[in-house]
Curated annotation (Swiss-Prot):
GO biological process terms, semicolon-separated: cellular response to hormone stimulus; circadian rhythm; G protein-coupled receptor signaling pathway
Glycosylated residues, chain numbering: 11, 14, 36
Listed InterPro entries: GPCR_Rhodpsn, GPCR_Rhodpsn_7TM, NPY_rcpt
Entry protein name: Prokineticin receptor 1
PANTHER family: G-PROTEIN COUPLED RECEPTOR (PTHR24238), PROKINETICIN RECEPTOR 2 (PTHR24238:SF74)
Transmembrane feature ranges: 63-83, 99-119, 147-167, 181-201, 233-253, 283-303, 323-343
Family: Belongs to the G-protein coupled receptor 1 family.
Pfam families the record matches: 7tm_1
Species assigned in the record: Homo sapiens
Lineage: superkingdom: Eukaryota
Disulfide bonds: 137-217
Subcellular location: Cell membrane
Gene: PROKR1
Phylogenetic placement of the source organism: Eukaryota, Metazoa, Chordata, Craniata, Vertebrata
Length: 393
């Protein structure tokens, strides 16, 4: 379940009227749910005599998001596990670029195995109702938000690393301690800036139609703190989308000029040409990942800005729910694209993982191989061209 946000006053007697609302047909207060990093599950026009969650449109949307969640659990769960296992097992894969990619893999893996099952229950099984308590509500939303920021910051770090390695090759590469500090910074920044989303996340029981209740799980900011919320959202929009996208675009534009439009001085040996091809392939993959990131998350942020800053656009919009799920699924699919690109395209982690399984199967079958024998075999495995490619020294 994505992080959501609404505004409610401290006395629960009235709420902001400048945002879309979910109205209690029995005369209770209206609760507004424009929210921060996702789309308000209840922020849709509801008929007093009809439960929207029982409509045909909602049923179709439920199938779509269910398929997306299953895809994330399978692709990100299995794919990132393979990448992490291969990285742990083989030292040959532990270069700076792969260590940065591992941050994406870990965050996406945690979301796939921890968050997605709860999201499946929330969106598909219980039709927008949370039944797992306040602690899990806060934890799942917080983990999902941190994962998004880790992915963004890691992609930015990878772009800067590629820029320094290719445009300024004579500068010394990042040392192990510096790389460790960079990885720690990626997680620390992501954890800290997501704290407000956890602080304001709570459960709220809503009466949707007649006596039917739905338990909303998401961010609810006090009505007198709307300005703080908008400022916080614009801050996040700037440092976690606009800033990284502009920086990565400039980095890859300069890298492209260096690799494709600048003549290499001197005689080009086959080794130099091979290295150039490898670098071009890696940069193309990274630029495709950047493009996918923009295409997936730009609708997400655009939808949120329209909903939170121009709420009248969605007033009485019958297809709001459909639009919500379309944008939701597009944003969620970005983690699958990253996994497919990094695991199946960028390197040979799948091949290495197969060799791990094969060696352990042979050891179990023969019964006489020690773990030391396996270590000698795996450490002595030759590096493939693709592994050499991703080193980019």
């Amino acid at each position: 379940m994505e992080t959501t946000m609404g505004f409610m006053d401290d006395n629960a007697t009235n709420t902001s009227t400048s945002f879309l609302s979910v109205l209690n047909p029995h005369g209770a207060h209206a609760t507004s749910f424009p929210f921060n990093f996702s789309y308000s599950d209840y922020d849709m026009p509801l008929d007093e005599d009809e439960d929207v969650t029982n409509s045909r449109t909602f049923f179709a949307a439920k199938i779509v998001i269910g398929m997306a969640l299953v895809g994330i659990m399978l692709v990100c769960g299995i794919g990132n596990f393979i990448f992490i296992a291969a990285l742990v097992r083989y030292k040959k894969l532990r270069n700076l670029t792969n260590l940065l990619i591992a941050n994406l893999a870990i965050s996406d893996f945690l979301v796939a195995i921890v968050c997605c099952p709860f999201e499946m229950d929330y969106y598909v099984v219980r039709q927008l109702s949370w039944e797992h308590g306040h602690v899990l509500c806060t934890s799942v939303n917080y983990l999902r938000t941190v994962s998004l920021y880790v992915s963004t910051n890691a992609l930015l770090a990878i772009a800067i690393d590629r820029y320094l390695a290719i445009v300024h090759p004579l500068r010394p590469r990042m040392k192990c301690q510096t790389a460790t500090g960079l990885i720690a910074l990626v997680w620390t920044v992501s954890i800290l800036i997501a704290i407000p989303s956890a602080y304001f996340t709570t459960e709220t029981v809503l009466v949707i139609v007649k006596s039917q209740e739905k338990i909303f799980c998401g961010q609810i900011w006090p009505v007198d703190q709307q300005l703080y919320y908008k400022s916080y959202f614009l801050f996040i929009f700037g440092i976690e989308f606009v800033g990284p996208v502009v920086t990565m675009t400039l980095c890859y534009a300069r890298i492209s000029r260096e690799l494709w439009f600048k003549a290499v001085p001197g005689f080009q040996t086959e080794q130099i040409r091979k290295r150039l091809r490898c670098r071009r392939k890696t940069v193309l993959v990274l630029m495709c990942i950047l493009t996918a990131y923009v295409l997936c998350w730009a609708p997400f942020y655009g939808f949120t800005i329209v909903r939170d800053f121009f709420p009248t656009v969605f007033v009485k919009e019958k297809h709001y729910l459909t639009a919500f799920y379309i944008v939701e699924c597009i944003a969620m699919s970005n983690s699958m694209i990253n996994t497919l690109c990094f695991v199946t395209v960028k390197n040979d982690t799948v091949k290495y993982f197969k060799k791990i399984m094969l060696l352990h199967w042979k050891a179990s079958y023969n019964g006489g191989k020690s773990s030391a024998d396996l270590d000698l075999k795996t450490i002595g495995m030759p590096a493939t061209e693709e592994v050499d490619c991703i080193r980019l020294k």
